[in-house]
Amino acid sequence: MENTEKLKNSKEVIAYVAECFPKCFTLEGEAKPLKIGIFQDLAERLNEDEKVSKTQLRAALRQYTSSWRYLHGVKAGAERVDLDGNVCGTLEEEHVEHAKATLAESKAKVQARRKEQAQKARDEGKAKAKAKKAQQPRRQAPKAPKVEKPVETRALNADEFITGKEVNVNMGTGNMAATIVEINKEDVRVQLANGLQMVVKAEHLRA
């Protein structure tokens, strides 16, 4: 037996009904006024259809007939249609006036809701701007840069030229910390703090 998946919401039900009865229901443009008692006809025609229940049909029909598209179509001179698109009488003035009032009320509610949401968004924006301003730290006068005194160095004594001795290498632009790793007469191999090894003259090393 084939497993029929039920429709999930009124939107899907309306789309399905419009597919089954295209001369009666539409998804775009102005909707046609429906025959009075069309729910019963719809329930009977779809009685064996497992995709949709009577409860879903009733809810979907209520949503369809309260939409602006449908209410716009309920106007003087318009004719009601059945499921097959057959004309079932002209609309009564009472129904036309009721549709106009319902449409005006619905539009007024939407407009009021939009106005309320816009005001709420403005209020939230002001509150955020105020909070952001309060969180901003006061600007402090920039502190004068701390001038570090140059490290005073001296020439190495003869007995200080030993492997593992921490020294300063005079690079011309300043001193760099290093460690003696090898001594070969006047040439001394040192390792800088960054791991780089280099050979320098003994006269360039300072304590």
From Swiss-Prot:
Biased composition (Basic and acidic residues): 113-127
Gene Ontology MF terms in the entry: RNA strand annealing activity; RNA strand-exchange activity
Keyword Cytoplasm: yes
Keywords: Chaperone, Cytoplasm, RNA-binding
Subcellular location: Cytoplasm
UniProt function note: RNA chaperone with significant RNA binding, RNA strand exchange and RNA duplexing activities.
Name this polypeptide is given: RNA chaperone ProQ
Source organism of the structure: Vibrio atlanticus (strain LGP32)
